[in-house]
């Protein structure tokens, strides 16, 4: 065996070379700049013995991952575009050497095969993957504001055709084994136990390239077909990205250039565009977010070790309760008991759980047997039957302080001695909910966002006497549910709702001043939010906003006083999407601004401001409030504030979050902006 640290190879009796990748002292394989010399040495040795080798299998020495991608620190270490381009060219050169070997090369894939890992696999003649749920293939570079820089933009379209390649590269989606096989990304998907044997069989085959179908050729290889596809792809992508993600145009350019000018020039363009993107502020912000998320995954929320959780209880069978029950089973793999005061509520929760599982079944993510097994993990009760076995109870009843206090008392009386009570409140102080509790140290806030299965953030809110063990336990549970938890101080609005409120209030003021509904939403969509503020009000519910705003005003002062809009809409039964009309009127899946709203609110709609001014009027109060939250210790760090805003309310990720955005603007420019807007519109813009 030739040992080169992360890369070692040997040859078996069938004259198959086995190249094993096993990065020392790391759980996951990642491609690092320092490995270039090691890979070069291994390839030199293999090429020297090529007359005695019939095929090559590339495999991982890790138990559950192939290659998770390239080490992102390599890009951060690049001082300029020239260094970034050299980095990409080095990867391209090494992978080209693998492609040029005179015998068949096979990637034997088990576990994540992402980014540079998939680009390595694409340089092989064949790809064989395990059919295990751990196995996922993808090119997620676009999510970091980059593009695949080691041949991915050139090899994937040539392998599977233009349309599916665009879908994979532009979205950064991860493919499961069945989908990868169907698309032709892999040549076989087999049980993990026989992966090596099947890979060896492929290694003994002749070198082969997949032939595109006539339809794929027509779309990919002739200029007319290509022009149609690229034109449509650019329109669709930019409609979604609104020019805020330069990686999208760069990806389209690289693929089109390669198909038009050939592989060599395509690779050159790929390296150039990779280097340009690596230097953009958008990529820097997205990579910073990636590092923040990676760092946060290691944190427990406190110094205490979390308790083991097997059984979870949920109080309330509504949308929130049903969603919490679902992720506790489907993601966290817990057994759940859900309690509601009547069977209708329980039925709603069962249906909610079933419908989401059935969606997974239809997408072939789970089998029918797995669906049935996960349905059996949910038990519904109308009394406190079985609560003695529950480790954590998550309360998701109405926003009523007395009711929540009653739930605390009942659970601590009916449950096990050390049961944790987590309240999913969006506005009520956790300390007040814990008043009179037998064990206040076991009470904590756990604020989910709707819809639970889609929204990634959870706010963990300890009150003054919540124990460290309680904090670390619910943080661990939230992570198991697939959530990103941030620990925030017990104060009105916590963090996310507190910074959202002034943003929404400013949008309402703009509406009352005559800015049309669709113009307001478009302005913030252009800024980078996934949903405009008026649409968001409809989604959340006008009545919910009306309940939260007075609480914030009472606790935090006049700057949270909301315009006189909400009650008028509520009196007219305009609660938003759930009642089919709010600011918009909803017909099936379509919506349009309801012109009657203008009459109701005595508004003459006429746009007076630029979209940029509209956006800044809404965003600046949010930034000011975020800074106050940090100064008051509501959040522990700028990092937590950025993550909370991005994953809780959709603050534009390419800006890095409110604090990264403020740092990018600079203290002087931000202060000038605030003063200018304060002079025009009022003191609420002054920090």
From Swiss-Prot:
Protein name, as recorded: Fatty acid oxidation complex subunit alpha
Renumbered residue ranges of the record's region Enoyl-CoA hydratase: 1-191
Assigned keywords, A-Z: Cytoplasm, Fatty acid metabolism, Isomerase, Lipid degradation, Lipid metabolism, Lyase, Multifunctional enzyme, NAD, Oxidoreductase
Pathway the protein contributes to: Lipid metabolism; fatty acid beta-oxidation
Compartment annotation: Cytoplasm
GO function terms (MF aspect): 3-hydroxybutyryl-CoA epimerase activity; enoyl-CoA hydratase activity; long-chain-3-hydroxyacyl-CoA dehydrogenase activity; NAD+ binding
UniProt xrefs under SUPFAM superfamilies: 6-phosphogluconate dehydrogenase C-terminal domain-like, ClpP/crotonase, NAD(P)-binding Rossmann-fold domains
Record site feature (Important for catalytic activity), residues: 119, 141
Organism: Aliivibrio fischeri (strain ATCC 700601 / ES114)
Enzyme Commission no: 4.2.1.17, 5.1.2.3, 1.1.1.35
Cystines in this chain: none
Residue ranges, annotated region (3-hydroxyacyl-CoA dehydrogenase): 307-687
Family: In the N-terminal section; belongs to the enoyl-CoA hydratase/isomerase family.
UniProt GO BP: fatty acid beta-oxidation
Catalysed reactions, as listed in the record: a (3S)-3-hydroxyacyl-CoA = a (2E)-enoyl-CoA + H2O; a 4-saturated-(3S)-3-hydroxyacyl-CoA = a (3E)-enoyl-CoA + H2O; a (3S)-3-hydroxyacyl-CoA + NAD(+) = a 3-oxoacyl-CoA + NADH + H(+); (3S)-3-hydroxybutanoyl-CoA = (3R)-3-hydroxybutanoyl-CoA
SUBUNIT field: Heterotetramer of two alpha chains (FadJ) and two beta chains (FadI).
Cellular component GO terms held in the UniProt record: cytoplasm
Function description: Catalyzes the formation of a hydroxyacyl-CoA by addition of water on enoyl-CoA. Also exhibits 3-hydroxyacyl-CoA epimerase and 3-hydroxyacyl-CoA dehydrogenase activities.
């Amino acid at each position: 065996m030739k040992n080169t640290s992360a890369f070692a190879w040997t040859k078996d009796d069938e004259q198959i070379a086995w190249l094993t990748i096993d990065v020392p002292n790391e759980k996951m394989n990642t491609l690092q700049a320092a490995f270039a010399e090691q890979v070069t040495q291994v390839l030199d040795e293999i090429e020297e013995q090529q007359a005695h080798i019939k095929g090559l299998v590339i495999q991982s020495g890790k138990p559950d991952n192939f290659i998770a991608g390239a080490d992102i620190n390599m890009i951060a270490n690049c001082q300029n575009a020239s260094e970034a381009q050299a980095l990409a060219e080095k990867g391209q050169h090494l992978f080209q050497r693998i492609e040029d070997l005179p015998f068949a090369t096979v990637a034997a894939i088990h576990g994540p095969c992402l980014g540079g890992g998939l680009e390595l696999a694409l340089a092989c003649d064949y790809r064989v993957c395990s059919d295990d749920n751990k196995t996922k293939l993808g090119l997620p570079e676009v999510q970091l504001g980059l593009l695949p820089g080691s041949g991915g933009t050139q090899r994937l379209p040539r392998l599977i055709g233009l349309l599916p390649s665009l879908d994979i590269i532009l979205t950064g989606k991860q493919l499961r084994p069945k989908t990868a096989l169907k698309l032709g990304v892999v040549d076989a998907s087999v049980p993990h136990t026989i992966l090596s044997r099947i890979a060896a069989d492929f290694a003994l085959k002749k070198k082969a390239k997949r032939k595109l179908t006539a339809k794929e050729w027509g779309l990919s290889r002739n200029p007319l077909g290509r022009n149609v596809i690229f034109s449509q792809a650019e329109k669709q992508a930019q409609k979604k990205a609104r020019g805020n993600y330069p990686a999208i145009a760069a990806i389209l350019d690289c693929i089109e250039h390669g198909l038009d000018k050939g592989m060599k020039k395509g690779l050159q363009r790929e390296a150039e565009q990779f280097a340009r993107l690596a230097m953009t502020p958008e990529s820097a912000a997205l990579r910073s977010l990636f590092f923040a998320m990676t760092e946060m995954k290691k944190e427990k929320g406190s110094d205490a070790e979390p308790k083991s959780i097997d059984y979870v209880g949920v109080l309330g069978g509504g949308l929130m309760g049903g969603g919490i029950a679902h992720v506790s089973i489907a993601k966290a793999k817990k057994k759940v008991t859900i309690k509601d005061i009547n069977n209708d509520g329980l039925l709603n929760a069962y249906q909610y759980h079933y419908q989401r599982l059935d969606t997974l079944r239809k997408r072939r993510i789970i089998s029918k047997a797995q669906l049935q097994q996960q349905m059996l993990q949910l038990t519904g009760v109308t009394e406190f039957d079985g609560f003695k076995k529950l480790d954590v109870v998550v309360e998701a009843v109405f926003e009523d302080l007395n009711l929540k206090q009653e739930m605390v008392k009942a659970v601590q009386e009916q449950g096990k001695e050390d049961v944790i009570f987590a309240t999913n409140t969006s506005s009520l102080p956790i300390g007040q909910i814990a008043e009179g509790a037998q064990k206040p140290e076991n009470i904590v806030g756990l604020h989910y966002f709707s819809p639970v299965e889609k929204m990634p953030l959870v706010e963990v809110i300890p009150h003054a006497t919540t124990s460290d063990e309680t904090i670390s336990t619910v943080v661990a549970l939230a992570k198991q549910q697939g959530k990103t938890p941030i620990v925030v101080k017990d104060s009105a609005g916590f963090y996310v709702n507190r910074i959202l409120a002034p943003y929404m209030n400013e949008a309402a003021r703009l509406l009352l001043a005559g800015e049309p509904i669709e113009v307001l939403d478009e302005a913030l969509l252009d800024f980078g939010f996934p949903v405009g503020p008026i649409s968001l009000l409809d989604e959340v519910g006008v009545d919910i906003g009306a309940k939260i705003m007075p609480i914030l005003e009472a606790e935090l002062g006049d700057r949270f006083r909301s315009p006189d809009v909400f009650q008028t809409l509520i009196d007219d039964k305009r609660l938003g999407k759930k009642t089919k009309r709010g600011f918009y009127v909803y017909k099936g899946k379509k919506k349009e601004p309801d012109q009657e709203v203008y009459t109701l609110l005595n508004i003459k709609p006429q746009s007076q401001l630029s979209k940029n001014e509209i956006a800044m009027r809404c965003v600046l109060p949010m930034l000011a409030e975020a800074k106050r939250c940090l100064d008051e210790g509501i959040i522990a760090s700028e990092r937590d504030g950025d993550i909370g805003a991005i994953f809780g309310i959709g603050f534009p990720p390419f800006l890095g979050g409110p604090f990264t955005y403020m740092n990018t603007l600079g203290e002087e420019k931000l202060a000038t902006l605030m003063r200018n807007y304060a002079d025009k519109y009022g003191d609420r813009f002054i920090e």
